Amino acid sequence: MARSKVTDVPMALAVKIELFKRGCFDFITVKDGLKHEKQEHALKILTDNEHVELLYGGAAVGAKSWTGAVWLLFMCLCYPGSKWFIGRAELKRITQSTLITFYKVCNQYGVDDTLYKYNGQYNYIEFFNGSRIDLLDLQYKPGDPLYERYGSIEYTGGWIEEGGEVNFGAYDTLKTRIGRHLNNELGLRRKLFITCNPKKNWMYDTFYKPDKKGELPEYMYYLACLVQENPFIDPDYIEGLKTTKDKVKRERLLKGNWEYDDNPNALCSHDAICEIFGNKISIKTGTNYITGDIARF
């Protein structure tokens, strides 16, 4: 239900809302004469009429969480009655991290707590104009492998935070739930925003590999952003990443390397394992093989 009391939006905020609707994002992406070009690019994709799914990330500290929070905040302010979600592998990670970022974003752009209310009992943020953001627990549950608990909820769009922690089933279900709430009335394309660090899971197979091959469908977009491309980051943080002794962590978070190997002693690569189910040689010859470590049984 929308909040019934009449609330006046401060003039300074009203100007920002209008700028956002017009696609002018400098008040977000520019600071001290420097512009976060990748963040600008992400916001343009998130507000265009061409793309549906955006995977943004590829390394640590690319302003991914800030971008997600500011996008949802201003979409709610710009489009009364719209309905969105933020989903993470565990709800407590939203309340302990993502929600804190959301509050910082509100403070940064002059959105005080008279304009929205957080309901901690039912886990949603409701705005004065009837817009709403649901906070979703995307943890995999054996009793609900298809995420049917979200199968009948309708959203305008949404954001999956830290996609590397999230099960494919959550992504596969939620992308069918967007574009279902006032999109036609508000003139909005359905949008699913996914932020991440490199991880060899469904993001690697669904976004990164097809993009690398030039085969990513036109409605999908992968936007890589390395830590060095964030002009607002403390240089000392980058130096800290460079000194880590964990090679995999350094490759993922500093270099944005998706091709890293979790286990250098692995007998089979990730790609080889994924190709088991569509191996052209087995299809051609009709011969299949299976191996087993019998000593373990």
PLM-predicted stretches and their roles:
Residues 65-80:
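Walker A/P-loop NTP-binding motif
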